[in-house]
Amino acid sequence: MSQLTELAKKRLSRSMMFVPGNTPKMINSADIHGADSIMIDIEDSVPVTEKDTARLLTAEALKSRKFRGETVVRINHPTQTPYGYDDLDVIVPAKPDMIRLPKTEDVSEVEIVAKKIEEVEKANGWPEGTINIIVAIESVRGLYNVREICHGPRVVAIALGAEDYRADLRTGKHKPAVELLFARQTILHAAREAGIRVIDTVFSDVKDPQGFREEVEFIKALGY
């Protein structure tokens, strides 16, 4: 494993700002909150009719401006959707710091993304490990394969995607989030064993600062 990938495993990940890739105004202002990572999303937040536009806008933003935070692009899954391979073809040459692979269920899916990154790095003469991978666990199958996934090529971080995971469990959102406890602990243990970063799920209620604080204190107590 490259030195750059090893360094990326240790990078600070206190906060990640999600912005939709089809909204240039939000992409351009993503830095103002000082997040450690800027994640441009061309997956769930972008309608099917705007996938091509979001892909091109995201690539152009990565090429034309310097973000202060670490840059991450959440692509569409290459084997679960018809958009993922096109995402890789356009986004990887734009040189984000990381590709986020959503709905990861098997290490073979990570290998597909890693292979494309390797091809682009070599073609451009970039050092190995210039671009790395963050995986997202969003299903029961992914959770049960999490140890192998964490050891996948170029994987430097892992996150929990709670909404799809809840749907796979056939449950809903609760307070406290008892339905996420097993997943959070399992992902945390796998990440610690693999020596990679671990990132909790999104807190989406921007009107509940007290709830946000309680959630942060809880996951910190778990070991995040």
Residues covered by each model-derived region:
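Expand to "…catalyze enediolate/carbanion chemistry for C-C bond making/breaking, isomerization
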Residues: 1-224
